[in-house]
């Protein structure tokens, strides 16, 4: 009785493996940036719930926008790379290629997002992306970054008028640590 169900399970697993391998090989035959067709084909296959066509349409538009932006950035980088290679070949006759190709079809979404962020950062002349830093509980927040040189000199007269208390408060702001105690902690503490 266990034999036919095991064989059936094995047959299903083998057919799924063959299906996945054939789909992966069909994707390998495409060009390196055929992601736009892959995105539209993925959305054409349909989602599991028919109640979210607006959500899938918005997701597809966002993905296509990111795709177009990525292709523009890659084209710019390729043009810059070709110009650099042309100038380098004039100086040095033989130089090994240092480019690295990325397979966007098999790239995980997080890696794709990080690559897109890095390309945006490189395109914006190496300026680091803005990151919001939140202080840890119980630590102090330095507010000196909020004050620039002009603002600090403008406030110097006001500081003397108040007696130095304003700048004292601006220099260090403490965040007290208050642990949240739920019902379980209150019950355990009451025993």
Curated annotation (Swiss-Prot):
It is found in: Secreted. It comes from the Eukaryota. Expressed in a subgroup of neurosecretory cells in the subesophageal ganglion from embryonic stage 9 to larval stages. One of its GO terms (cellular component) is extracellular space. Keywords: Amidation, Cleavage on pair of basic residues, Neuropeptide, Secreted, Signal. GO terms for biological process: ecdysis, chitin-based cuticle; larval feeding behavior; neuropeptide signaling pathway. Residues 25-119, 185-191 form a propeptide. One of its GO terms (molecular function) is signaling receptor binding. Residues 1-24 form the signal peptide. The modification Leucine amide is found at residues 137, 181. Belongs to the pyrokinin family. Probably has a role in larval molting. This is Protein hugin. It comes from Drosophila melanogaster. The gene is Hug.
């Amino acid at each position: 009785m266990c034999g036919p169900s095991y064989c059936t399970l094995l047959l299903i697993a083998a057919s799924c493996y063959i299906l996945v391998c054939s789909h992966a090989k069909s994707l390998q035959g495409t060009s390196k940036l055929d992601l736009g067709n892959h995105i539209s084909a993925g959305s054409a296959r349909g989602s599991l719930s028919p109640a979210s066509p607006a959500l899938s349409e918005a997701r597809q538009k966002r993905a296509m926008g990111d795709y177009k932006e990525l292709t523009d950035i890659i084209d710019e980088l390729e043009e810059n790379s070709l110009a650099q290679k042309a100038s380098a070949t004039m100086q040095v006759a033989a130089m090994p290629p240092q480019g690295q190709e990325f397979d966007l079809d098999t790239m995980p979404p997080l890696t794709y997002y990080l690559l897109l962020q890095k390309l945006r950062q490189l395109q914006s002349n190496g300026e680091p992306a803005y990151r919001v830093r939140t202080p840890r509980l119980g630590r102090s927040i330095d507010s000196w970054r909020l004050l620039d040189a002009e603002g600090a000199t403008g406030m110097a007269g006001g500081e003397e008028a108040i007696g130095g208390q304003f700048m004292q408060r601006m220099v260090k702001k403490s965040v007290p640590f208050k642990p949240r105690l739920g019902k379980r902690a209150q019950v355990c503490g009451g025993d």
